[in-house]
Amino acid sequence: MSTATTTSTPAQNVDLSKHPSGIIPTLQNIVSTVNMATELDLKAIALGARNAEYNPKRFAAVIMRIREPKTTALIFKSGKMVCTGAKSEDASRFAARKYARIIQKLDFPARFTDFKIQNIVGSCDVKFPIKLELLHNAHTSFTNYEPEIFPGLIYKMIQPKVVLLIFVSGKIVLTGAKVREEIYEAFENIYPVLSAFKKVNAITQ
């Protein structure tokens, strides 16, 4: 899992009407899908393309990588493709187009249809420790907290439909969004809750 990175953007650079907390979550990963609308010979693609691997006994797709944008694609026989690793929606689309062009250059009549963002992952750091057990007790219908299995509290927000992983350190991971605004909205929704369960003394839970 990616470690949460930059969040403490100076307040004067943040539009407080959109980000009242003064914190803007960083986008860490975009997962997108596209349909190339043609059946593919995966063995031929793996042999013809650079940075491609295909082991059908392990996984029924070609795994292909490009450096710019730094992404990985899963390319299936049906012509469906999953692109992961981009840091923005535009970069994800650009990378998916690059993969489609590689397939075209290998003489497959690949098209670029039904491009969709399936998941956006963001992260941030509120810069204060959080009383996870008390937060869980107060929001049991939305949360799952089993520290012996996973150190973070899982918070399933209903609106927007985003899942948050909340760690005692104040690091937050947000996943499940289809558009970046849902990441921002989910964080602004949770920020007052996190503030209410801020650890005043790091020794006490």
From Swiss-Prot:
- A single MF term (Gene Ontology): DNA binding
Keywords for this protein? DNA-binding, Nucleus, Repeat, Transcription
Q: Where is this protein localized, as stated in its record?
A: Nucleus
Q: What GO terms describe the biological role, i.e. biological process, of this protein?
A: DNA-templated transcription initiation; transcription by RNA polymerase II; transcription by RNA polymerase III; transcription initiation at RNA polymerase III promoter
Entry keyword annotation includes Repeat: yes
Recorded hits in Pfam families, A to Z, give: TBP (PF00352)
Q: Which Gene3D superfamilies match?
A: TATA-Binding Protein
Q: What is its main location?
A: nucleus
A single cellular component GO annotation: transcription factor TFIIIB complex
Q: Where are the sequence repeats?
A: 27-103, 117-194
Organism domain of life: Eukaryota
Which InterPro entries would you find in this protein's record? TBP (IPR000814), TBP_CS (IPR030491), TBP_dom_sf (IPR012295), TBP_eukaryotic (IPR033710)
| Family membership | Belongs to the TBP family.
Q: Which PANTHER family match?
A: TATA-BOX BINDING PROTEIN
User: What function does this protein fulfil?
Assistant: General transcription factor that functions at the core of the DNA-binding multiprotein factor TFIID. Binding of TFIID to the TATA box is the initial transcriptional step of the pre-initiation complex (PIC), playing a role in the activation of eukaryotic genes transcribed by RNA polymerase II.
Subunit details:
Belongs to the TFIID complex together with the TBP-associated factors (TAFs). Binds DNA as monomer.
What is the name of the protein in this document?
Answer: TATA-box-binding protein
> Per UniProt, what is the name of the gene that codes for the protein in this document?
tbpA
